[in-house]
Curated annotation (Swiss-Prot):
Protein name, entry field: Probable ketol-acid reductoisomerase, mitochondrial
Gene: ilv5
Annotated PANTHER family: KETOL-ACID REDUCTOISOMERASE, MITOCHONDRIAL (PTHR21371:SF1)
GO biological process: isoleucine biosynthetic process; L-leucine metabolic process; L-valine biosynthetic process
Active site, per annotation: 178
Organism annotation: Schizosaccharomyces pombe (strain 972 / ATCC 24843) (Fission yeast)
Amino acid sequence: MSFRNSSRMAMKALRTMGSRRLATRSMSVMARTIAAPSMRFAPRMTAPLMQTRGMRVMDFAGTKENVWERSDWPREKLVDYFKNDTLAIIGYGSQGHGQGLNARDQGLNVIVGVRKDGASWKQAIEDGWVPGKTLFPVEEAIKKGSIIMNLLSDAAQTETWPKIAPLITKGKTLYFSHGFSVIFKDQTKIHPPKDVDVILVAPKGSGRTVRTLFKEGRGINSSFAVYQDVTGKAQEKAIGLAVAVGSGFIYQTTFKKEVISDLVGERGCLMGGINGLFLAQYQVLRERGHSPAEAFNETVEEATQSLYPLIGKYGLDYMFAACSTTARRGAIDWTPRFLEANKKVLNELYDNVENGNEAKRSLEYNSAPNYRELYDKELEEIRNLEIWKAGEVVRSLRPEHNKH
């Protein structure tokens, strides 16, 4: 469809939605709010001023939930509460990088544990971590740490657990950012020690986004959970750490709910499902005689550049109100058909996540010695699909690339 956002229709949308306003910034400005930051940082930066208000009970469509905010944990409280702790970041991938730098910038005592002289070790040095002072091999970091933040990949956690487990001694805290290893313990063989707090903080975004939003003084939404509370302080510890690593708003969940919703989301609307829908529509348009440019524009470009940002900022109803009456009528009429078709697939997906089939598939694939080669091959196949080749050209024609 065409995105017919005339002045008349914009005013109608404004009347429909009350005081909310149409986004006026260019898409390039919107994109900058989620852009990946540079991987090089100064050794330390001053933590940005956070705009927060405290814990409150909020009504989510009739269900009341507690939501914690950063103001419960100002920087001074964080530093005092964790003054006797050493946060050991195990793994320096996406989450290790973002969470580690944020906690360090909050003034906490943070060290990093990775394989010596590997790519992550070298990246950590570039980011200001000092070998022998704040950067150590994994086992040494665990011995030195009091809060062990296991941010390795799921497959790597399974592989390294036999060596890590004996080092997580009484009095330490075991921290995860994903419930995978603990909930699917029959496959991962990860059984946390009985005499330590086991907690989870799961940022709702990549580690790069965690870092970017922190540097902008905002903060990412995160969930927290307690699997095992030995000290009686596991919950407050989890919330404090959530703030320390850059969270703005923090929601309570369980390890099981976190991992199931996460895996379903990634395979569904967030990545797999939307990719499948993009491909299906593009292929139908091409098979029916439309050009690659037209098919891509009506499938991906208009969605990501015009419509999805409005949904993210104001909601689906606002996006509908900003479009033509013809577009709205068709969207509303066809929604039940797509809902019916997709619920069947999503229920099948949920079952496969809940019964451990997806965990088994993930561990087997990502533990294979040649998994990187297989993964690169799959990405290359995606990259070479006509839809994304056409997309490269369409993106090059965006206004921000053609300033004269």
